[in-house]
Amino acid sequence: MNKFKLIVTTPERVLISGEVSRVLCKNAVGEFEILAGHQPYLTATVPTVTRIDDENGESKYLFTSTGLMKVQNNEVTFCVNSAEWPEEIDEARAMNAKQRAEERLKNKTDELDEKRAKLALARAMSRLKLKEM
């Protein structure tokens, strides 16, 4: 199986740095897949559950938030604001964040408030989705 190097980093830590066979993620346009030999690519990511298939084809799932993903020279680098493995997610905290975001969307006062609330809701929903997997 063809493989490539994957690095997922946040301002606080590196979550993964190793060989993988496939990555499935999401940007504002929709889902995308990265395989070995992918053409150079740069995109902004959105909060989602990112799927990582290791060199043996086994899947791991990771919450990734907003940030950038770069593909170059058979290496994929995620620089995201936050990322968490399923066991690191505080389900109660994510549920509270979801409820707060939904309340802010109901009582929005301006466009900036709405954008922030939608982003917070997307983060919370992605964390909860990963926790349920």
From Swiss-Prot:
It comes from Clostridium perfringens (strain 13 / Type A). InterPro entries: ATP_F1_dsu/esu_C_sf, ATP_synth_F1_dsu/esu, ATP_synth_F1_dsu/esu_N, ATP_synth_F1_esu_C, ATPsynth_dsu/esu_N. SUPFAM superfamilies: Epsilon subunit of F1F0-ATP synthase C-terminal domain, Epsilon subunit of F1F0-ATP synthase N-terminal domain. The keyword Protease does not apply. The keyword NAD does not apply. Produces ATP from ADP in the presence of a proton gradient across the membrane. Pfam families: ATP-synt_DE, ATP-synt_DE_N. One of its GO terms (cellular component) is proton-transporting ATP synthase complex. GO terms for molecular function: ATP binding; proton-transporting ATP synthase activity, rotational mechanism. F-type ATPases have 2 components, CF(1) - the catalytic core - and CF(0) - the membrane proton channel. CF(1) has five subunits: alpha(3), beta(3), gamma(1), delta(1), epsilon(1). CF(0) has three main subunits: a, b and c. The gene is atpC. It is a peripheral membrane protein. This is ATP synthase epsilon chain. Keywords: ATP synthesis, Cell membrane, CF(1), Hydrogen ion transport, Ion transport, Membrane, Transport.
